[in-house]
Amino acid sequence: GKIRYVGLSNETPWGVLNFLQLSKDKKFPRMMSIQNPYSLLNRSYEVGLAEVSIRENIGCLAYSPLASGYLSGKYRNNSFPKGSRMDRDWDFWTRYRKPNTNEAVEHYYKISKKFNMISSAACD
């Protein structure tokens, strides 16, 4: 079969532009999407990648929109239920443990309650 559509994951703006140039030079299928983490706690996509995506017409497939559970409301106030993913794999979660994480999660939680929404709906 033929490759008709190409996408990248976890790439930088520089990498995306290099892939676009390579596909043009070699007459490869053009990249159509980029899959990167994106949530209210991780907005790094907005620094460079969003501009490249818009200008080059590349779709964004966001993953971890609820920050792997942080924005669901179940990890509020540094409470990590026994047997939860946070409890089982503490090192993995360092990407979300920042000085303002708990404060941000609490603000999002309060917004959801104010508008009678479940926490995850307020973070979509």
Question: Which residue ranges define each predicted feature?
Answer:
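Beta/alpha (TIM)-barrel catalytic core signal, keyed to glycine-rich beta->alpha loops juxtaposed to Asp/Glu
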Residues: 1-124
